[in-house]
From Swiss-Prot:
GO terms for molecular function: ribosomal large subunit binding. Transmembrane segments: none annotated. This is Ribosome-recycling factor. It is found in: Cytoplasm. Residues 134-167 are annotated as: Disordered. The keyword Cytoplasm applies. The lineage of its organism: Bacteria, Bacillati, Bacillota, Bacilli, Bacillales. It comes from Staphylococcus aureus (strain NCTC 8325 / PS 47). The keyword Cytoplasm applies.
Amino acid sequence: MSDIINETKSRMQKSIESLSRELANISAGRANSNLLNGVTVDYYGAPTPVQQLASINVPEARLLVISPYDKTSVADIEKAIIAANLGVNPTSDGEVIRIAVPALTEERRKERVKDVKKIGEEAKVSVRNIRRDMNDQLKKDEKNGDITEDELRSGTEDVQKATDNSIKEIDQMIADKEKDIMSV
């Protein structure tokens, strides 16, 4: 039965980590190297993440500076950033690429908050589905005689505790991201 509880916690933690990655990709109007996480460049025929082709610095709150290790890849990186449709406009001087991150309007901030809430709700649904799967597994084990009725009750309570903790953590992550987005 402890295997089921451990699997529950592990799967719920993966959902939380996935949420964390998704939230990192939502810009709060400040320059952040995570903005380029999903951008891949066709580098000598292989799709390669920008982070592997260049160093990314944030010298100012609203400026990203990308310094490619291979200066011949500047144009390719610039095209990939434009193609990624991130809502930013890269400029290049042939050696480095600069991205000025525009300040978010109140309307855009509210849209981003809606997106954050939607992503958070999807994570909660994922956690609840894991809870249902694990409870079903416990009931099946009890029906097969692998565990007793008391162990079923105890296991169900442990799964519920793990669910409650995960939901609380998700709510906190969402609240923090909302605060980050809405702060000017």
